[in-house]
């Protein structure tokens, strides 16, 4: 490999990325390691993380405020797509990776870096997401992946960092790997690697336990315009505020925990714990509003598109032609997704109890009612059923003769 003199490293302050700084300098002989810290609304003191990078040997450390872009360009499209990987996971971590990769490439261009680097391990999904996004946006840039090459366990990585005076953010006795952004938290490793071991309560931070959540339910209304959430309880909010408020409301009532077996891109199954209260709540409400504003065939086909959309994002193809085409289809369905959805939060549940679309509802009470106001023409049903089932009737007659 041609000698790299300057590299931009995606930096979080965690075990792997912290160890990457001395590793890149000492093992690769790179003179300048510039770190990029993405502000994704994780609520950490990013200035401390920036200083940690500098103290670990980085020549420069850059903080990028990506919160608004993260919500508007990534989270909101996921809501429109009702994105749930394996029908459970709303891609809270996966959505952040292409945005970080995009900024890595942009910074590399600005400072004339030879390469970009990340601290993803060789068995995770994030390595795929970073590499595919970087290759799509900066195919000429080298990608350096120390954690994929050094073959160190998490414990060994901690010890390596300690040799260079880098304190680990986790204890050796409780080595959870936690990723946090505005959309949620992902927790793995430690005792969670036993799929039968119940996740301890102390790993959760965004959601209350069912026992500690309020005894009385809370009813809320979520307002949508063109498929985007725009308000909660008659209060119109900007995109970031929508996510923040949804997180607080759903989290307080214990909604938004996911404990699942996940099929990783690299072919293995992994036990994952997620907290995504606001995003799950908004997807649930959005899907419900579509049930009253979209035609049945559109809903049916959009379900196929949604599944593929979620797979593409999970597998790292955010910047790809199929994803772009699916985006166009989804956007075309959302002009009529306007209205409000009422949800009851209680003891870990979010139960839809109402939905309305003043201008785009396909529900006709005068057709659906069983009261005297019914305008449905019942006499047409017999002819409809005769034609609807004709092919099946012919098949049945033919096969009954064969049996005789």
Swiss-Prot record:
Its main location: cytoplasm. Keywords: Amino-acid biosynthesis, Arginine biosynthesis, ATP-binding, Cytoplasm, Ligase, Nucleotide-binding. InterPro entries: Arginosuc_syn_C, Arginosuc_syn_N, Arginosuc_synth, Arginosuc_synth_CS, Arginosuc_synth_type_1_subfam, AS_cat/multimer_dom_body, Rossmann-like_a/b/a_fold. L-citrulline binds at residues 89, 125, 129, 177, 186, 262, 274. ATP binds at residues 10-18, 38, 119. GO terms for molecular function: argininosuccinate synthase activity; ATP binding. Pathway: Amino-acid biosynthesis; L-arginine biosynthesis; L-arginine from L-ornithine and carbamoyl phosphate: step 2/3. One of its GO terms (cellular component) is cytoplasm. This is Argininosuccinate synthase. It comes from Prochlorococcus marinus (strain MIT 9312). The lineage of its organism: Bacteria, Bacillati, Cyanobacteriota, Cyanophyceae, Synechococcales. The gene is argG.
């Amino acid at each position: 490999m041609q000698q790299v003199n300057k590299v931009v490293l995606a930096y979080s302050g965690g075990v792997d990325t912290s160890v990457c700084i001395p590793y890149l300098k000492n093992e690769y002989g790179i003179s300048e390691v510039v770190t990029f810290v993405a502000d994704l609304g994780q609520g950490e003191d990013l200035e401390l993380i920036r200083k940690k990078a500098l103290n670990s040997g980085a020549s420069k450390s850059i903080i990028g405020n990506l919160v608004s872009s993260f919500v508007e360009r990534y989270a909101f499209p996921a809501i429109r797509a009702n994105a749930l990987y394996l029908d459970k996971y709303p891609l809270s971590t996966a959505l952040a990776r292409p945005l970080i990769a995009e900024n890595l490439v942009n910074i590399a261009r600005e400072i004339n870096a030879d390469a970009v680097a990340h601290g993803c391990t060789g068995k995770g999904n994030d390595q795929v997401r970073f590499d595919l996004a970087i290759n799509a946006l900066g195919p000429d840039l080298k990608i350096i992946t120390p954690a994929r090459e050094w073959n160190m366990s998490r414990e060994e990585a901690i010890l390596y960092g300690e040799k260079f005076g880098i304190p680990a953010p986790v204890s050796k006795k409780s080595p959870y790997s936690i990723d946090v952004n505005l959309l949620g938290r992902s927790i793995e490793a430690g005792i969670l690697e036993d799929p039968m071991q119940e996740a301890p309560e102390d790993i959760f931070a965004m959601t209350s336990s069912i026992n500690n959540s309020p005894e009385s339910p809370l009813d809320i209304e979520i307002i949508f315009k063109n498929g985007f959430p725009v308000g909660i309880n008659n209060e119109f909010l900007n995109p970031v505020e929508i996510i923040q408020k949804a997180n607080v409301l759903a989290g307080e009532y214990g909604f938004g925990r996911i404990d699942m077996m996940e099929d990783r891109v690299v072919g293995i199954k992994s036990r994952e714990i997620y907290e995504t209260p606001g995003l799950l709540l908004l997807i649930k409400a959005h899907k419900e509003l579509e049930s009253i504003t979209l035609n049945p065939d559109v809903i049916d086909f959009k379900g196929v598109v949604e599944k593929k959309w979620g797979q593409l994002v999970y597998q790292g193809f955010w910047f790809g032609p199929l994803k772009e085409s699916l985006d166009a289809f989804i956007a075309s369905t959302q002009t009529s997704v306007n209205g409000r959805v009422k949800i009851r939060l209680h003891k870990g549940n979010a139960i839809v109890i109402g939905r309305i679309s003043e201008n785009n509802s396909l529900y006709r009470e005068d057709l659906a009612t069983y009261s005297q106001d019914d305008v449905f023409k019942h006499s047409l049903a017999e002819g409809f059923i005769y034609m609807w089932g004709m092919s099946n009737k012919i098949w049945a007659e033919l096969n009954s003769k064969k049996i005789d």
